[in-house]
Amino acid sequence: MKKLTDTEKYYSLFREFYEACAGERARIDKCESMFRGDHWYDVPADDPKEPRPVTPVLHSSIENIRADLEDYIPEAIITADSAAYSELAGTLTGIIRENHLNCSYDEEFRKLTHDLLVSGWAVQEIGYDPAALNGMGSAFIRHVDVGSVLFDPVESDIQDGRAVFKFARHTREWMREHYPELADSMKDDGLFMDTDEKGYLTPRMDKSVMLIECWEREYDSKTGKHRVHMLKFAGGVMLEDSRKDYPDGVYAHGKYPFVVTALFPRRGSSLGYGFVDMFETSQRYSDKLDQIVMKNAMLASHNKLLVTGASGFDEEDLKDWSKEVHRGDNLNGVTWFATAPLPQYLISYIEQMRAEIKEESGANQWSRGNTAYGVTSGTAIAALQERSSKRARMAAKSLHTAFRMAVEQEMELEREFALGLRCIKTYIDRSDEEGARRAEAAAREIMNKEEMPISIRVTVKVQKTAGFSAISHNDTVFRLVESGMITPEVGLELIVFDGKEQAKALMKNSEFGIRNSESIR
């Protein structure tokens, strides 16, 4: 039996994963079709002219929950139980915040919410870009499309899988630009991505090549640690292999740089189900009943006339509404009959089904800001909105847990590659040279360790606190300041309002200017 080369071995593993996940890709495509209201495509039509109505209740409900999740965009706060690392923890918080501003994490979060609610699971990738920040380098967290990543279908934890694959098609011109020495060796590999079933985009597959990125994790029984490697191949050619340059692994933490979030977890899998899976049947039935109502309305809109042969009337003559007189023998041979109306309970049932989709998904009237009982107070409406968004809070909790895990990997990458330089830059920007020296010393100590000290931990808070919570929180802080239990400076740190960081910076600059003017005098 011929021994497979490394490239052939990884292609074989990729095909195994790809074929095993064919049903999952079909489910994701179906969920996207349901989300955009295009779910009649797989229903055969008895009559090509029959109506196919769509009332996008499910789409509206999902978008309403996504809008709620906009108030839950996470922010990482680094804390330290040890006083020796307290100053460094504050610096790390600023570094992580800068990373997320650079990679536009708020936009990545919006993409994650779409995948989570529609497809049922979302993926974040954690990596390091050495060219970022003008060559200083920084870690990043970004969204990965669920249709372009493959996990081991055998394992329920992605960290236990044989590999993780990312894949995308690129033109041969792109390949020549990035891999000029290997591009001409690439051949057609017979791999084609699932394309849009509507056929809006019909690319020439012969002008592109599938680029596959493979992450492989191996366990060293002697050291009791894992190593993670990255390989890239396309057109039957191995393009990159980190095992040559980094035999101990790409990243010291030895984990797959991916975090998966499942909305409704599945037993025995790292993936999940979404709102479309839960409410697909209700959406289909409500639209089917709409079709019945519309058919009935179209039939009722046409007057029907029964004419017997003994009536003596001509059918074509009766169709001519411009005539005032029609000649015939027997008027009893002409009978009008109307389409029977549908029962009223059918209309009520349609409304009830749609109301249940909104209510059970959490997109009810209170979460939309509507009230049916005359509530006009802004505070009361905000409180009702917060109470009604349980579904959104549940999804946000899952996303925040995944975000914390991603930030922990992000900190490990900063510690491994550039923490010392980042700390110096942070304090130099503040014109604090002494602080820069202290931070660099603490950073160097941590960088010499094999992993981040357990006393440094990540907590997650939302960037924007909900209106009702912010009002209640700030009122408590004001009372504590008025009673003298805390100082105004502490109160400023505790209160929540937009532009807080800018206000603090202006106050510090003002104090610095006053001290300088006094020293000159």
Where are these regions (language model features)?
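Extended, helix-rich architectural segments
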Residues: M1-A234, L239-E240, Y349-Q352, E445, ...
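C-terminal anchoring/interaction modules
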Residues: M1-D46, L116, Q124, P130-N134, ...
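Helix N-terminus capping/helix-initiation residues
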Residues: N64, D145, H170-E173, G274, ...
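Generic detection of long, well-ordered alpha-helical segments
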Residues: S82-A89, N102-D106, G272-Q283, I347, ...
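Short conserved micro-motifs at the rims of enzyme active sites and ligand-binding pockets
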Residues: G135-M136, R243, S270-L271, I471-H473
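Short intrinsically disordered coil segments
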Residues: F140-R142, A163-A168, D277-M278, S472-L480
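Catalytic nucleotidyl-transfer cores of nucleotide-processing enzymes
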Residues: G224, V228-W321
